[in-house]
Regions:
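Active-site-proximal or metal-binding-adjacent scaffold patches in catalytic folds
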Residues: 1-116, 126-164
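Walker B beta-strand of ABC/ABC-like P-loop ATPase nucleotide-binding domains
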Residues: 119
């Protein structure tokens, strides 16, 4: 049961509905109706500009980002769709903190709302490192439909795996 793997933790009725959509071949149509908008953020520089725009809109006082880009190896190696890293770099007698956000290349072709959701998730890690209540509250502040988009992302991943 593919839905159980991606939707673990959701109510059994919801898992059954998602699995039925998949088995009936209606999952792609359902997602196309829910998430019709596509995006043009295809390059690392466009992604950096997109992330910076969201960051200045919602997290003005957060530390600057040194790198934002797509990462082709991300999903395979770390079983993650996006990462945020903080690395300390020695420059002479000073320590400098580098902050990076990497997004799986899967999102180059994903609907715009799903890209926005993963970027919001990684930006929230600039303030809150752990996945706790303040973290999700911040995500919801930046993207009011965050929890619905997270569920839609899980459905999208199910559909993508089925296409392989």
């Amino acid at each position: 049961m593919l839905a159980a793997r991606y939707l673990a933790g959701y109510p059994p009725e919801l898992i059954a509905q998602a699995e039925q959509l998949r088995l009936d071949g209606r999952l792609a149509d359902h997602l196309a109706r829910r998430l019709p908008e596509r995006h043009e953020v295809r390059s690392d520089s466009a992604l950096f500009a997109y992330v910076q725009d969201l960051k200045t809109r919602h997290l003005r006082n957060a530390e600057p980002l040194n790198f934002v880009g797509y990462d082709a190896k991300l999903r395979v190696l770390q079983h993650a769709l996006g990462t945020h890293t903080r690395r300390t770099q020695v420059q002479g007698a000073k320590l400098k903190m580098r902050r990076e956000i990497r997004v799986a290349t899967l999102f180059k072709e994903a609907p715009a709302a799903l890209l926005r959701m993963i970027v919001v998730h990684e930006l929230a890690h600039l303030r809150e490192l752990e996945h706790n209540k303040p973290f999700y509250k911040l995500c919801q502040h930046m993207e009011p439909d965050y929890f619905q988009l997270e569920f839609d992302l899980r459905l999208y991943l199910m559909q993508q795996e089925e296409l392989k």
